[in-house]
């Protein structure tokens, strides 16, 4: 998290205080990550003046899956199945907004770009994804994050073609246009390519977990992306044009790193008590001070694989150099003689 902390009196007009943003981000990661059952084991918060108008949040996940399941390729006549959360007006233009220039009016004009998340729904979708994967019930899957159905179906059908029936998509409420249905983004909604012979079992599996699954089209070997709304064709583009039709944007930039100067440190001899105030200033710096208040909000023990944890030491109150996760926790693999050292 890259944030700037400064007094309210020094903020530019229309800028929300960075401290409020920081607490909101911390709470968002906590509430979503903990409910999803994903261990949050590492992170950093960096404070700098340059982030006063545009704080940055970088997130990353590391996962593992069987090698034979690491490739995805929709097959002709595979059903396009929407699974998870319903479609609403929230999350429209979220991907483009995140890269846009922010102004004092952005909060009002672009409020709809923010997704209304539901961690519980996504957790159930994740459980379905893993069970259906192990049973070999789908040939490809993509999330509806940036771009919604438009990016998910467009990406999956690039080498094949797709026909989408937008009026079949489950909606949160009535009144959405087919354009809004097509581009609305949601992290807890995913698109699966399901062979027709597996649809009955796939639907049964989703029902067992109370997860909504609806067929909204099929992948067809036409090389085109066709969108239909109540039997009317509202868009028809070739996949080649969709992915390669626009000339690539080429930009040139020159990076000139600043010189750190002489890195040598001058040692000053004298009474150590004279340096107490300087030491307290360093320890009080937001970039140096303890981040335990953030770390303790995150569940880094879930799944039972955390061997080296974020905080170490006798009192478990000092930051460690790194975290270590055991990839396949099993009681048979644990050495009881070494367990106390990992407690």
Regions found by a protein language model. Give the residues of each.
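Short, small-residue-biased leader/transition segments that mark boundaries at the very start
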Residues: 1-3, 329-333, 338-343
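Glycine/proline-enriched, intrinsically flexible loops and inter-domain linkers
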Residues: 4-328, 332
């Amino acid at each position: 998290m890259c944030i700037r902390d400064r007094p309210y009196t020094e903020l530019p007009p229309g800028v929300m205080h960075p401290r409020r943003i920081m607490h909101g981000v911390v709470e968002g990661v906590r509430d979503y990550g903990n409910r999803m059952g994903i261990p949050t084991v590492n992170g950093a918060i960096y404070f700098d003046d340059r982030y006063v108008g545009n704080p940055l949040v970088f997130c990353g996940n590391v996962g593992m899956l069987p090698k034979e399941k690491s490739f995805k390729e929709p097959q002709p006549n595979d059903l396009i199945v929407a699974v998870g959360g319903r479609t609403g007006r929230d999350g429209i233009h979220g991907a483009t907004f995140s890269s846009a220039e922010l102004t004092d009016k952005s909060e009002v004009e672009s409020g709809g770009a923010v997704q209304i998340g539901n961690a519980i729904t996504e957790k159930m979708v994740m459980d379905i994804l893993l069970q259906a994967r192990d049973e070999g019930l789908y040939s490809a899957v993509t999330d509806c994050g940036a771009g919604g159905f438009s990016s998910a179906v467009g990406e999956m059908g690039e080498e094949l073609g797709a026909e989408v029936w937008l009026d079949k998509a489950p909606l949160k409420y009535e009144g959405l246009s087919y354009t809004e249905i097509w581009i609305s983004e949601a992290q807890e909604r995913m698109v699966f390519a399901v062979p027709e012979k597996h649809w009955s079992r796939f639907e049964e599996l989703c029902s067992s977990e109370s997860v909504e699954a609806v067929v909204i089209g099929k992948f067809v070997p036409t090389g085109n992306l066709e969108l239909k709304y109540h039997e009317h064709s509202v868009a028809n583009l070739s996949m080649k044009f969709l992915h390669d039709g626009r000339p690539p944007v080429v930009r040139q930039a020159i990076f000139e790193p600043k010189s750190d100067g002489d890195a040598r440190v001058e040692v000053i001899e004298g009474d150590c008590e004279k340096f107490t105030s300087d030491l307290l200033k360093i320890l009080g710096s937001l970039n140096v001070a303890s981040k335990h208040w953030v770390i303790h909000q995150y569940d880094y023990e879930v799944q039972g694989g955390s061997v080296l944890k974020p905080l170490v030491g006798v009192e478990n109150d000092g930051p460690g150099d790194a975290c270590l996760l055991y990839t396949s926790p099993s009681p048979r693999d644990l050495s009881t003689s070494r367990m106390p050292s990992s407690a």
